[in-house]
Amino acid sequence: MKLILTLLVSGLCALAAPAAKRDGVEDYAIGIDKRNSVEDYAIGIDKRNSVEDYAIGIDKRNSVEDYAIGIDKRNSVEDYAIGIDKRNTVEDYAIGIDKRNSVEDYAIGIDKRNTVEDYAIGIDKRNSVEDYAIGIDKRNSVEDYAIGIDKRGGSVEDYAIGIDKRNSVEDYAIGIDKRNSVEDYAIGIDKRGSVEDYAIGIDKKRGTVEDYAIGIDKRGGSVEDYAIGIDKRHGGH
């Protein structure tokens, strides 16, 4: 999990994203929505030396970690956590916890290292092993290398939120929803040679190519370099 996150964070850019000002307050920001204030509703802050050091997504609505969506404090209780929602209890509704031996009930991101779901990138065990799982890597099964499977609809990739088949049309895709067409509401396409090269989230149905894009990395060294999360619903920022 840490390797996947590291790869995503280290090389991704956003198209028409809020500026990552390299030397400014949002330096190394991983997706910022500046609707009302600097960090207001921010969805990704890495300040390297602050309280949220190595944070992968902070929502500072009421307190420092209040409703945080990604904290890695390395030595704290949430060590290795990939997303914490502290609404009522420490792990309450956690969106990614690796406690190695504790109860991961309702967790949407588990690394059990030696269990059946080894290498799983998100498990919800509410009713069965893979029931509504949002991330399975079984290495030798049909969903090999899958980065998110939801089997609710009845078919293998039905409403899948992440498929990597290496040789198919969605080669290297980081999130596919095949409801009506190949890229229909896709949440992450990387075709390596197209306009969306290295894209981490494209929704091509609303009217324009980048409309509602959730992260574009064109590696061209633009101002928004390394941004990972854009919502252009209201014309950008």
Curated annotation (Swiss-Prot):
Phenotype upon gene inactivation: Impairs the production of ustiloxin B and its intermediate ustiloxin F.
Pathway recorded for this protein: Mycotoxin biosynthesis
Disulfide bonds: none
Keywords: Signal
Superkingdom of origin: Eukaryota
Propeptide residues, chain positions: 20-22, 234-237
The keyword Signal is assigned to this record: yes
Signal peptide boundaries: 1-19
PTM comment text: UstA is processed by the subtilisin-like endoprotease kex2 that is outside the ustiloxin B gene cluster, at the C-terminal side of Arg-Lys, after transfer to Golgi apparatus through the endoplasmic reticulum (ER). Cleavage by kex2 generates 16 peptides YAIG-I to YAIG-XVI. To process the precursor peptide further, at least two peptidases are necessary to cleave the N-terminal and C-terminal sides of the Tyr-Ala-Ile-Gly core peptide which serves as backbone for the synthesis of ustiloxin B, through cyclization and modification of the tyrosine.
Residue ranges the record marks as coiled coil: none
Task of the protein: Ribosomally synthesized cyclic peptide ustiloxin B precursor: Part of the gene cluster that mediates the biosynthesis of the secondary metabolite ustiloxin B, an antimitotic tetrapeptide. The ustA translated product contains a 16-fold repeated peptide embedding the tetrapeptide Tyr-Ala-Ile-Gly, that is converted into the cyclic moiety of ustiloxin B.
Protein name according to UniProt: Ribosomally synthesized cyclic peptide ustiloxin B precursosr
Species, as recorded: Aspergillus flavus (strain ATCC 200026 / FGSC A1120 / IAM 13836 / NRRL 3357 / JCM 12722 / SRRC 167)
Gene that encodes it: ustA
